Amino acid sequence: AATRDHPHAGMQISPDQGQLLALLVKLIGAGRTIEVGTFTGYSALTVALALPDDGRLLACDVSDDYTRVGRPFWQQAGVAHKIELVLAPALQTLDARLATGAAGTFDFAFIDADKVNYDGYYERCLALLRSGGLIAFDNTLWGGAVARPAQTDDTAALQGLNDKLHHDERIDLAMLTVGDGLSLARKR
């Protein structure tokens, strides 16, 4: 209810997306995961619940106010020990992980943050993922706006990302009509 009743609840993933993310994490046997854009913590909670007890989620966000909503629920669900919340620009956080030699050590990433940086998040998460790892992108249909001439920078960024993913030979791709569009990219 805390997320559902939040003034910006529309930014949160849908319950069916949460169920799908949890299933994907389990299907690939993920142990180390990344989330770019935590908002009120619902997607972090669903991923953390799907992880084994020694699994870890690196949650990247810039808002203490938004993430503060979800932190008590992580505690109540018994998964707070799995979640490392880093409050800083995600590109900076991901670059820092790459600089410490973490390339190829993560299994799963979920990207749901500022759309204009999706390409940067993609490149860094792809570098951090192992072969066979999976990246899930939220909002890739963008209310259907990606099928029309771009009216905003966000729409243009998502159109560019969708085109890039479609032609990227480093991945296998599926775009699902779950929520506002959920694209799945498996690193080859």
Model-flagged regions — what are they?
Residues 1-12:
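Rossmann-like AdoMet
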Residues 11, 15-188:
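S-adenosylmethionine/decaboxylated-SAM
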